[in-house]
Amino acid sequence: MTFDAIDQMAVSTIRSLSIEAIQAANSGHPGLPMGAAPMAYVLWNHVMNVNPKTSRNWTNRDRFVLSAGHGSALLYSLLHLSGYDVSMDDLKNFRQWGSKTPGHPEVDHTDGVEATSGPLGQGIANAVGMAMAEAHLAAKFNKPGFDIVDHYTYALHGDGCLMEGVSQEAASLAGHLKLGKLVLLYDSNDISLDGPTSMAFTEDVKAKFEAYGWQHILVKDGNDLEAIAKAIEEAKAETDKPSIIEVKTIIGYGAEGQGTSAVHGAPIGQDGIDHAKGVYGYDAPAFTVPDEVARRFEAGIKFRGEAAENAWQTKFAEYEAAYPELAAEYKVAFANEPVHVDLNAHELGSAVASRVSSQQAIQQISEQVPSFWGGSADLSASNNTMVKAESDFQADNYAGRNIWFGVREFAMAAAMNGIALHGGTRVYGGTFFVFSNYLLPAVRMAALQNLPVTYVMTHDSVAVGEDGPTHEPIEQLASVRSMPNLNVIRPADGNETNAAWKRALAETERPTMLVLTRQNLPVLDGTAENAEAGVNKGAYIISEAKGDLDGIIIATGSEVKLALDTQAALEAEGVHVRVVSMPSQNLFDEQDAAYKEEVLPAAVTKRLAIEAGTSFGWGKYVGLAGKTLTIDTWGASAPGDRIFKEYGFTVENASQLYKSL
């Protein structure tokens, strides 16, 4: 691959558009775009197979993740030059209200952006997930002569991404899985926001990644287009290992303060722009693209991508004729439509932990939904997430549907985001609920990106018992419930668990977190008939008062049974209360005023909420006149039933609390 003066001009155009957008906004990060523009240009205009005309609709396109999302001006410049729906006016409106060019890339907001990025390191894990999805779908759908799924995943990152723990978890997993179609481009400039990386980051990146099972390739000069192209070709030629291409760059190349942290995160000023353009030998007016550069992109990424997709569409038509059932399944998998399943009801009189009823649901879902796969962060035996009839997803069996994420909660959740962003599958992942704290940054990104992933969180309360307070969730429910666009469902029995899974699979634009018990839960009267509608509405009357309504007991999960027993005890004393099962506060909050009034009449102020977690957040449901039977301290090490008793989760105490209202 050879390059000429027009290619160099194209690199200068990318650099200039980026720093001009940042200057117009008087906000942004010029250092990365100025330093990394050459590698980004080579990748985009000479290597990647994407079709700007169809954008993310072509399923076999290459994927690109800007893990160092603060360098978004670089990406927007590339998108504009490549023919995506990012205009010059959009570049001029960088970081402004309502613009297509926000401070960090946002998927489904800006045409051509594959992943929302910014929190450092997560983009690497997203890319690992995308590569996992590509490998899985290729093993599933490809046939001799028909490589329907055959593309690469690229991510551009900096030193900061490698300092984050999530990138190390993800890199370890990718090396184990031998994801040969994953290529990282490492903007290695030895500078972080605070100063030289020598202050805090002195490890041997090459040795570390080789120990992970990666190929490491070094490009000594980040402005050497030929060397960069050769390195990418070498990375693509290695099929049994992921590759990291370390490109030694100068942060803020061309600026007076190049090579220092001063150019990392602030505009360089108009004088600085003029100086940089002088270094580049580039005199095009601000926010313009030389005709030669425009033609080079027309002949590069635009022509190559359109030709590649046209060839793929022709091949897929032949594939569809030869393998109609597989082709139909492929189309359904990428449609991102609500998934509907039938699950066996749980009969009154039986009792299983909701993690076990979830396991039973997972087995049934896997039989009905071929795109369904997932796993656990080394807790499959406890989370009950493995599909017994399916094989494992490993380097020698990418068709497997059981994913072993290892003890890597954060990377698991971030990789799940990448899997969902890639499309073609419905993914789930599990761990203990107390460890949800380890993965919350990735859950937040899933909610922000409207990704329909499912989290299987088990061991949901102090009923964990003997393991003690380190493993007993207290504040977690309040924490995850506070997150926008996240379904949180804590089912009371097997039928509510079935309904929770059905709701999760019906979602197409938000993640769902299932919060499940370790201990057995009896099947409750009426849930076989009412749980599905009740869960979908977030709360429902599971047992009505037997006489004139005195008050309401609201409960979730394992405490619904306690609420029902308390209701019976109060009835025996002539006190008539309603019991409301509230598996999902957020779904209840979305109901209309009439339904909320039906379940929780405003005139009924005597309310008691029962939940084995913090009281935080319950005030909006019980009101100032109500009370809670909750836990606002840490758990303890003892059998779970003893802990419940010590913390007052008994019929006697609940009855007294209600009567004190």
Predicted regions and their residues:
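Non-catalytic terminal/interface segments that mediate subunit docking, oligomerization
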Residues: 310, 314-452, 530-541, 547-548, ...
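A short, small-residue-rich loop immediately preceding and capping a beta-strand
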Residues: 25, 62-63, 113-116, 146-164, ...
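Thiamine diphosphate
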Residues: 96-108, 132, 136-150, 167-288, ...
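A short glycine/serine-rich beta->alpha loop
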Residues: 4, 21-30, 59-67, 109-121, ...
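N-terminal capping segment at the start of a domain
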Residues: 11-27, 187-189
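Terminal amphipathic helices with adjacent charged low-complexity linkers/tails
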Residues: 59-60, 243-338, 586
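Buried hydrophobic positions in well-ordered alpha/beta secondary-structure cores of metabolic enzymes
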Residues: 18, 29, 39, 75, ...
